[in-house]
Each structure stands twice: as C-alpha cells, then as structure tokens.
Design a protein with these regions (language model features):
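Catalytic cores of nucleic-acid ligases and guanylyltransferases
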Residues: 2-177
C-alpha cells in the first residue's frame, strides 16, 4: 500500500496496480492509518462473512483479476489487510532501519479494526517451545505459516532471503501417474 497525501495506490507483489479492484482497502487506509505518507508491506486476506474464517488466496485472486462489477465482488469476497512491515514513512526511507524499529513505526500508525486492518501478530522470543506454540496457533487460525525475522535486520526489496525466513508446514509427497 502506497500513500502520498490523498493519493493511495495498491500494488501486487509483481507491481500490478490493483487500486481499482479494492475500493474497500482504500477506505480502510483513509480511516485506520494515521499517516499521509507511507509504503506498507502487507497481505490482503479474504474471509467468509458468516464464519469469519480466512479463505485461500484463490478467493481474492478473483478480485485481483476483476475489471468490472467490482462493487459486487467487494460484497461477495470481503477482505482484510494484515500489515507486517513498513518501508517508507513521512518522507523517510526505512529500508536501512532495523526491523524492530520499523515494526514499532507500523504499530504507531495503524488503528486495528477487526475484519478491516490489523498488524500481523508477533512475538519476540528466544524460546523454541514458545515459538512452536505460536506457529501451531497461527496454522490453527488459518494462516499458511509464519515469518521469522531478525529484529536488527534491514529490509531487502525484492528479496525473499536475508533477515527473514518463512515457515510453512511440509506437504506430504505424492506418487502420481499422469
């Protein structure tokens, strides 16, 4: 999510502009983020309106590809924002800022609103058992995994390695004949 004063833009991981497809996110940003200039790294998650359970990514991919009847899709596939990092704030790049300070900055500007926007849950621990319990609870809540980050780590644009590690369950192998 990019914001520069009144201009708000939403981009996919591949830098596709999807602002038009997510008018609800634009409203969440205006209402719940207390800053007029930022770039936030986040995930958009679809959820079932009745059960409030997270949907798989394929559910929101319908909205990403949608060019028409957007308001209908907003109702059909409600979403929420889960913010996990901030790269730019009030005219200043935070790329060289340690993750712990970036996270504090992120927490300071977001007003969590259930089923609209939230900062990803986190813990700081050196205890393996505590980390394991956090991971298992994340999976039970419908998350696909957790990110493990170095509190002193800087942000590396476009990189999936360095100071972060994504932990997901290992899929069982399949024996298939095609």
């Amino acid at each position: 999510i990019h914001r520069n004063r009144s201009k708000i833009k939403l981009f996919t991981r591949n830098l596709e502009d999807v602002t038009r497809q997510f008018p609800d996110i634009v409203e969440f940003v205006k209402r719940d983020i207390n800053s007029k200039s930022f770039i936030i790294d986040c995930e958009v998650i679809g959820y079932d309106q009745k059960t409030k359970i997270w949907k798989p990514f394929q559910a929101i991919s319908q909205r990403i590809k949608r060019k028409y009847n957007i308001e209908e899709m907003v109702k059909k596939v409600p979403i929420m924002i889960l913010a996990f990092d901030i790269l730019f704030l009030n005219g200043k790049s935070l790329l060289e800022t340690p993750f712990e300070k970036r996270r504090n900055s992120l927490n300071s500007i977001i007003k969590s609103e259930r089923f609209a926007i939230d900062v990803a849950k986190s813990i700081v621990t050196e205890n393996v058992k505590t980390a394991q319990i956090f991971y298992e609870r994340a999976l039970l809540s419908g998350a696909e995994g957790v990110m493990v980050k170095n509190l002193k780590g800087i942000y590396k644009p476009g990189s999936r390695v360095g100071f972060g590690l994504k932990m997901k369950p290992v899929m069982e192998s399949l024996d298939l004949t095609i």
